[in-house]
């Protein structure tokens, strides 16, 4: 039996299992994606006592006494900074890897509010993206850090799409859902959705 905290709520788990399976199957928290189940892809990245950790390699027994945070448990200003930043730079394509990238980036920014490009690359080294390359993701994390430092403001006109047109940048209509891990993929659909 193990007791720990998930997004501030105390939970007790009777059976030893992978933390990712507990999050997804028992708590129906789908922002931690199951891309490999063996710690290779980073789509399940969460925070454990503030550090970016892959949920598929941590067991519930090893989580005992720890503070676990998923995308849902990030502070609202952090969530909004990443939604804006990833949307503004076009860092989201299919979106499957993005919640893990957000968690890796958020852990880095909490540790160093002004990360360099090299630090960002190092922070996401264990996170695989098959769509965007990494350039826009790195730019997105850098912009999120600038927003959180107060150096850049969220451009609500850009986010709302008030000024779309030929030759102008546009947010994907699903960027918020994909950044926050709310986008549904086949493995995210369970009996609660039926």
Question: What residue spans do the PLM features occupy?
Answer:
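Short Fe-S-cluster ligation motifs
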Residues: 65-93, 121-143, 156-173
């Amino acid at each position: 039996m193990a007791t720990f905290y998930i997004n501030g709520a105390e939970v007790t788990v009777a059976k030893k299992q992978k933390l990712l399976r507990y999050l997804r199957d028992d708590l129906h928290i789908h922002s931690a994606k199951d891309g490999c189940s063996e710690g290779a892809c980073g789509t399940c990245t969460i925070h454990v006592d503030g550090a970016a950790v892959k949920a598929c390699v941590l067991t519930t027994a090893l989580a005992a006494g720890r503070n676990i945070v998923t995308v849902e448990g990030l502070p609202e200003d952090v969530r909004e900074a990443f939604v804006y930043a990833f949307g503004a730079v076009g860092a989201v394509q299919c979106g499957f890897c993005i919640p893990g990238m957000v968690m890796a980036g958020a852990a880095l920014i909490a540790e160093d509010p002004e990360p360099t490009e090299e630090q960002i690359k190092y922070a996401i080294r264990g996170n695989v993206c098959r769509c965007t390359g990494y350039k826009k993701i790195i730019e997105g994390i850098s912009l999120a850090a600038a927003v959180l430092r107060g150096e850049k403001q969220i451009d609500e006109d850009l986010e709302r799409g008030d000024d779309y047109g030929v030759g102008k940048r546009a947010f994907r209509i699903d960027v918020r859902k994909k950044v926050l891990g709310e986008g549904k993929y086949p493995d995210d659909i369970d009996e609660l959705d039926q």
